[in-house]
Amino acid sequence: CIATQNHYGAIGTQALPESQLDRFMICMHIGYPDMKYELEIVKGKITTDPLDLVEPVMNGAQLLQLQEEIHKIYIHDAVYQYIGKLVNATRKHSLIELGISPRGTIALARMVQALAYLRGRNYVLPVDVEDVFIDVEAHRIQLNGKARVNRVTAEQVLKDILEGTTKPSVVKK
């Protein structure tokens, strides 16, 4: 499931409750396209419906097979411990009111398996965790009033947690 999110405070929008935010695996900020590309998008939309150009890249059975392959990607105990330490740090951080849930921990483990697969490995490295931690978890945590008053972002807090957590050295299985 892919969704777009309007800026909070825009007319007709309300923040999603934590229980719904927690069901999205990853949150990415794409930003605006440059003017040249945006005009290409507009011109293309006027002459053709972009949905008419969409073609499937795999069928449902192939997708399920791919998911099975990804779930077999090996995660060393030291990497699991690393994930656990990062998650636990969000639950104890002085600027976080609501830390990462078990669902968020599972999402992080699944995402690092997918990233290792895309990188051509059958095992996860700590760098895989570092590379997706903020994108997978920033939308899941709730900052407290002190953080909001000081205009601290969830991304900044998670970056601090990453930098303050010792990364394990793991060798290939």
Label each residue range with its predicted role:
Residues 92-173:
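C-terminal engagement/docking regions of AAA+ P-loop ATPases
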Residues 53-108:
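Conserved AAA+ ATPase small/helical "lid" subdomain
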Residues 16, 37, 74, 78, ...:
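Alpha-helix N-cap and coil->helix boundary residues
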Residues 20, 42-46, 87, 133, ...:
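Hydrophobic aliphatic residues
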Residues 1-73, 113-115:
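Canonical AAA+ ATPase core
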Residues 17, 31, 56, 72-76, ...:
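Alpha-helix initiation/capping motif
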